C-alpha cells in the first residue's frame, strides 16, 4: 500500500466538470486513466491477438471464378443481370476510349466530396440502368449503342467505369462505380457481354433486311440494294425453327440444309379482311388516280397540274407557234360587239369636227325619240282607262285625232330608218286653235350620200326604237280594240290622199279617233285631199313649236 502513489486512487470523475445543461466536460486536468495513451507496440500486440482468434476467409481472385462469369453472360442475354454498386457520378473527359482516361476520371470522382448513391446496376443487351435502392428511382439510363469504352480500375479492386456520349450536350462523359460485393472486372465483363449481344442483334437485323449500299466515287452517288421491310411474326418464327433444327443435328458431317418449314396461314371464318389498295392506286404517279370522273364531279382533269399541261399555256404556245409559222390563228367572232370607234375613212376629205357633230346629232335624235315613246306609253294607258268618259262634243280634240290618224298612214309608208349621215331638222310650226285645220310641222331631210351604216350600238338602239310597240292597256275596252282595227284598215286610203313626212308618235292617237267615229257618225270627217301643210300635228311633245335643241353630245 505504501509503494502506491497517492494519485492512483483518484476519483474517476476528477477533472470532469458539468456544464450549464448538466453535460460532462473533460478539462485539461482530466484523470490519468483517460489521458494516458497506450504505446504503439501494445496496439500492435492487441491487433495481432484479435486477428489470430478470428476466422479469416480466404481471398479468392475473380479470375478463378469462370463459372460465375458464364452465368453473367446468360443473365445479360436474358436481361436479368444486376449488381449492387455505389454510383460515384460522372465527369467530362476529352477522349472516347482508354484505360488511363477511365482511371483518372475515377480518381477525380473518389476524391470529390459527393456522397455516393447506393443502387442496383442492371446490364442487358439494350442498355445500362442504375436504380436507387431507397427511392427506386432511375438514376442512369444509358443505351448500349452510345457506350464507347468500359474498363475496371487497376488502382482499386472494385472500381469500374465506362465512357459514353451525352445525348443533350454531345460531350464525352465518364460514369464511375464501386462494386459492393463483386469486383470491377466482373462488372466490366458483364458490360462486354452486353456489347456482344447488341452487335449480334444488329447483324441479324442487317441480314434480315438485306440492304446493302455502294458508293461510287466517280459519280458521287449511293446505290442501295434490298429493302428495309420488317419481317412478320410468322417469318421470324419460321427462321427460328430452321435455326433450331440446324443446331440440333449431332454430327457436323450430317448437317444438311433442310427445306424451310411450310407456313400454314390460319383461317378464321369470322375475320373481316383488311381493305387493300387496287393495283392502279399502287402505281407510281404524280397525282392520285380516281375512277371515271362524272360530269357532276368538281375534278374535271385526268392529269397533273403541270405548267406545260395547263390548257391555257398549251393554247398560248400553239398560237405562238402558228403565228411564227406565218399562219395566224383566226379568232372566233365575239357575241358582243365592241365599242364603236369613228373610222378615219369616214371623215376623209371633210372636216373632222363636222363629222363628229353629225354622229352626235344622230345619237341625240334617237335618244329624244326613245324618251318621247316612253312618255307616250304612260299617257296612253291613262287615256284608255278614261275612254268611256270621252267628250265627243269637243270638236278640237276630235279633229286633232283625225289628223293624227292620217299622219299614221303616212308614217307607215314614208318612214325610213335613220342613218349616221342624216341630220333631222324640225320646221317651225304655228298651231291655230280657232279653226279645224291646223298647219302640221314639216320635216325636211338633207340628201347626203350614205357611206356606211351606224355602229353596232347605234344600230341596236335604232332597232329597239323601230320595233317597240306600245304596251297593252291594263283594262282593254271595246273602244281600244275597234280603234286598232280601224287603224290598220284605213291605212291604204290615207296613204293616197296624204303625203309628206310622218310623225311616229301620232299612230297611238288613231285608235281613240277611229272608235269615236264608229260610235258617233255625226262627227265631221276630215278630207283626205287636204294639204299636209294645212294639217296640225297631234303630237303633244313638239307643240308649242320650238327649235330642236341638242340635249347632249357623245364623242365616240
UniProtKB/Swiss-Prot annotation:
Phenotypic effect of disruption: In larval brain, leads to overgrowth and defective differentiation halting the development of secondary neuroblasts beyond the stage of immature type II intermediary neuronal progenitors (INP).
Location relative to the cell: Nucleus; Cytoplasm, Cell cortex; Cytoplasm
PROSITE patterns: PID
Stated consequence of mutating residue 52 to D: In 2S-D; phosphomimetic mutant that displays reduced cortical localization but no significant decrease in phospholipid binding
Gene Ontology CC annotation, any one: cell cortex
Region annotation (Disordered) ranges: 1-71, 519-556
Result of changing residue 48 to D: In 2S-D; phosphomimetic mutant that displays reduced cortical localization but no significant decrease in phospholipid binding
Main location class: nucleus
PTM entry text: Phosphorylated by aPKC which lowers lipid affinity and promotes dissociation from the cell cortex.
Region (Phospho-regulated basic and hydrophobic (PRBH) motif): 15-86
Biased composition, class Basic and acidic residues, residue ranges: 7-26, 40-52
UniProt-reported outcome of changing residue 147 to A: Loss of binding affinity to Nak and drop in binding to single helical peptide
Phosphoserine: residues bearing it: 537, 543
Listed InterPro entries: Numb/numb-like, Numb_domain, PH-like_dom_sf, PTB/PI_dom
Keywords (A to Z) from UniProt: ATP-binding, Cytoplasm, Developmental protein, Nucleotide-binding, Nucleus, Phosphoprotein
Pfam families found in the cross-reference section: NumbF (PF06311), PID (PF00640)
UniProt-listed GO biological process terms: asymmetric neuroblast division; centrosome localization; embryonic heart tube development; enteroendocrine cell differentiation; glial cell migration; Malpighian tubule tip cell differentiation; muscle cell fate specification; negative regulation of gene expression
Segments forming domain PID: 81-208
List of residues binding ATP: 22-29
Effect of residue 195 to V: Loss of binding affinity to Nak and single helical peptide
Modified residues (Phosphothreonine): 430
Domain of life (superkingdom): Eukaryota
Subunit note: Interacts with Nak.
Purpose of the protein: Required in determination of cell fate during sensory organ formation in embryos. Restricts developmental potential and promote maturation of intermediary neuronal progenitor (INP) cells probably acting as an antagonist of Notch signaling.
Domain description: PTB domain recognizes multiple ligands by engaging different amounts of surface area dictated by tertiary contacts rather than primary sequence. This may allow interactions with a diverse set of proteins during asymmetric division and specification of cell fate. The phospho-regulated basic and hydrophobic (PRBH) motif is necessary and sufficient for interaction with phospholipids permitting cortical localization. Phosphorylation of the PRBH motif by aPKC inhibits the association of the protein with the cortical membrane.
Protein name: Protein numb
